[in-house]
Design a protein with these regions (language model features):
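C-terminal (or distal) subdomains of carbohydrate-active enzymes
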Residues: 4-405
Length: 405
């Protein structure tokens, strides 16, 4: 970070690689006050609660599940009729072999819904928070559902006291979007996996690695599930009106916990925390931004200072993934950036005043100068002044840059 004579300390902050507000790699306060209007909360009949922020309208049933998630800007209802978003499900988990590793396809077809109740509704810094308690015998789940002012994102935080045997816990996130594929995050790229299973190969992908997010979209609209702390999920069509012969949406379920009995009969028993979010009107940029914030750790007593380097996307989506000192001990700054959406992109490199006059050149991934001749380069003109250097990226291209004073 850039050195100053004096910098304010932020009590709690996050530093994320990519943000939609242009504050990537800056320390951003937790629960920072906003000028947007506070979220409206209203108690409805039968113990239901309505949350509205002018962008989203959320109806939470008395059992803590969500019966309506309405994108008011687009008039799009995202919870299919007859389903509930945020419902916990217990599945049988008794694989024939590798008890703590395998997931049987058939186990995903038999789920028992857990029941819960709303405990409290409160507001803080304009955000509305609904606290839900869900229990099954000795297992207790406390969920905080949060809607923030002006946000396209509905956030979930779960504290789970897990005491099950041979059970598998998922949370159901049905979306009123009909799609045959979902787009998943992977390192330095995206990967598409089937929702509609047409072949034996498709059927074998009944559980998928989720990384930080999955985007489900049709030709005109998409939503994303942002994943903060779990790695597996399954996606399948939701059957609609049989007479009309069409589906009504996509069932997306995050895998939270299992309870194998071998080799350790107490595997995962105890307390766990999980975070996930649902982003409406999702784009790759919006999903990346939400994923960056959700996955960034909360830091304490963080100096409010300028990052040593930053990248301004001129067009397309370029992410500055990390920065570090060079391995050779020279004191040079190494920066890794990549194109994240699968298209062409142009960007401009910026450095903080402490590095004024520094030069930049592109290296290979091992920080060496011998670039491969059969790979594209992002820095077209070789070594040059670091401030304002122009970068060009192809789809999912990554670049390693060395900044030298």
């Amino acid at each position: 970070m850039c050195i100053r004579d004096r910098a304010d300390l932020l009590a709690e902050a996050r530093i994320s690689q990519f943000r939609n507000d242009g504050a990537s790699w800056h320390a951003n306060r937790i629960n920072e006050p906003t000028d947007a209007l506070s979220v409206l909360t209203q108690t409805l009949d039968n113990g239901r609660v309505l949350l509205a922020n002018g962008v989203l309208s959320v109806t939470i049933e008395a059992d803590g599940t969500i019966s309506s998630l309405l994108d008011e800007e687009h008039g799009r209802e995202l919870v299919p009729a007859g389903t509930r978003l945020g419902r916990y499900e217990l599945l049988k988990d008794e694989p024939a072999v590798w008890d703590a590793w395998e997931i049987e396809r058939e186990s995903l077809l038999m789920a028992n819904a857990m029941t819960g109740s709303i405990e409290s509704v409160d507001t803080e810094n304009g955000a509305a928070r609904v606290r839900v308690r869900t229990a099954d015998d000795d297992t207790v789940i406390t969920t905080i559902i949060t809607l923030r002012p002006g946000s396209h994102t509905l956030d979930f935080h779960a504290d789970i006291d897990w005491h099950e045997r041979e059970r598998f816990l998922k949370v159901a996130l049905p979306l009123g979007i009909v799609a045959d594929q979902a787009t998943y995050d992977c390192q330095y790229g995206l990967v598409r996996r089937p929702i509609v299973k047409n072949t034996a190969s498709d059927e074998a992908k009944y559980e998928s690695s989720t990384n930080r997010f999955a985007i489900i979209g049709d030709a005109g609209y998409a939503a994303a599930v942002i994943n903060g702390s779990v790695y597996g999920s399954d996606a399948s069509p939701i059957a609609g009106n049989a007479a009309e012969g069409r589906d009504s949406g996509t069932m997306f379920r995050l895998s939270l916990l299992s309870a194998p009995t071998f080799p350790d009969p107490r595997t995962d028993i105890g307390s766990h925390e999980f975070d996930w979010s649902v982003v409406t009107d999702a784009t790759v940029d919006r999903a990346l931004g939400a994923a960056g914030v959700l996955n960034a750790p909360v830091l304490h007593d963080v100096p409010d200072i300028t990052p040593l380097a930053s990248i301004e996307s001129v067009n397309g989506t370029v992410v500055l993934d990390w920065m570090k000192l060079a391995d050779d001990g020279s004191g040079d700054l190494i920066v890794r950036a990549y194109e994240a959406a699968g298209g062409q992109a142009d960007a401009t490199l910026h450095i903080c005043p402490a590095l004024a006059g520094a030069s930049v050149h592109e290296t290979n991934v091992l920080e060496g100068d011998n670039l491969a001749t059969d790979l594209p380069v992002a820095l077209q003109d070789g070594r040059q002044n670091a401030e304002g250097a122009t970068l060009h990226f192809g789809p999912f291209q990554l670049a390693t840059l060395r900044i030298t004073r």
